[in-house]
Amino acid sequence: MTAEIQQPPSQPPAQSSPMSAATDKHGGQPSVMESANCATKTKKTNAGIRRPEKPPYSYIALIVMAIQSSPTKRLTLSEIYQFLQSRFPFFRGSYQGWKNSVRHNLSLNECFIKLPKGLGRPGKGHYWTIDPASEFMFEEGSFRRRPRGFRRKCQALKPMYSMMNGLGFNHIPETYSFQGASGTIACPPNSLSLDSGIGMMNGHLPSNVDGMGLSGHPVSHIAANGGHSYMGSCTGSSGGDYSHHDSGSPLLGGGGVMEPHSVYSSPASAWAPSASTPYIKQQPLSPCNSAANPLSSSLSSHSLDQSYLHQNSHNTASELQGIPRYHSQSPSMNDRKEFVFSFNAMASSSMHSGSGSYYHQQVGYQDIKPCVM
């Protein structure tokens, strides 16, 4: 009995040894699992850490900043890398893709020039500098983005802008400008020709435009030979009456040549001085000789047996119905009306051009009309 009673306590140690070993094994497994979990946690924490923010500049601006920081205004590729890494924390991390961006911007952008490598210079790599023609993009530290060829396009468009600004009707060209120093109005003949730009308007304007006139400010009647003289030479006078034009004018004696009236020979309420007397009606012009001028039959609409004002009023009443009358205008507005209508009159009169002999006769004569300043 005693032996049977003593055996059970001896068995538990034998049984306890495998259990203890099992518990040791189970206790060792959690330690390995914990180490693996800790490793994954550290990886997750490392992956969750965000790298520094990228600088708020483009790569072009960063490269320019690096090159401008050098006293010689030139750097190699490795020196540009060093400048960016020392200046911005973003380029110090494990991410190395920014180096490719720097290389691509250096080689593909026209703002940077690769300088030839000097003789006897150790190492490899070329110096990079900024193109002098592109320095305006980065002046005063403002790194502004500009498309390729921006400067060349601006320089190419400058002449066109200046030409467009000079073609406004607010400015009369120099050939028709007022000469205030001498007190006269310069009206040089043959300054505008239909062959050099107005001839392309032939056939597009009605023939009755040359008789167009506004009330109180009639437009001059241009000669019907093609209008190679814009207006006769006009001299300004301080005041007084308009002189009569008698039929015995020496300009009308040979060949039946029509005299081109100047634009500024017509009366204007804004130009006429207060001390001057009203306009005196002109004498009727002498009719053209039909034998000397073969074009007299085709110029029925431009008959010379009527006075200047009578013909102007007749054309205005019969052909220009519905056109408003401008009774009071400023001198600048009158200038514009005369300038535009004179072009129309020249274009319409070019349709009546004929032989070359008639052209030579017209060029030889100039009509001198007194004008009121």
From Swiss-Prot:
InterPro entries the UniProt entry points to: Fork_head_dom, Forkhead_box_regulator, TF_fork_head_CS_1, TF_fork_head_CS_2, WH-like_DNA-bd_sf, WH_DNA-bd_sf
A Pfam cross-reference name: Forkhead
Start-end of Low complexity biased regions: 13-22, 286-306
Feature: DNA-binding region: 54-148
Region (Disordered): 1-51, 236-255, 283-306
General function of this protein: Probable transcription factor. Required for smooth muscle (visceral mesoderm) differentiation during gut development. Also required for normal proliferation of the lateral plate mesoderm. Acts as a downstream mediator of bmp4-signaling.
Name of the protein: Forkhead box protein F1
Species assigned in the record: Xenopus tropicalis
Species lineage: Eukaryota, Metazoa, Chordata, Craniata, Vertebrata
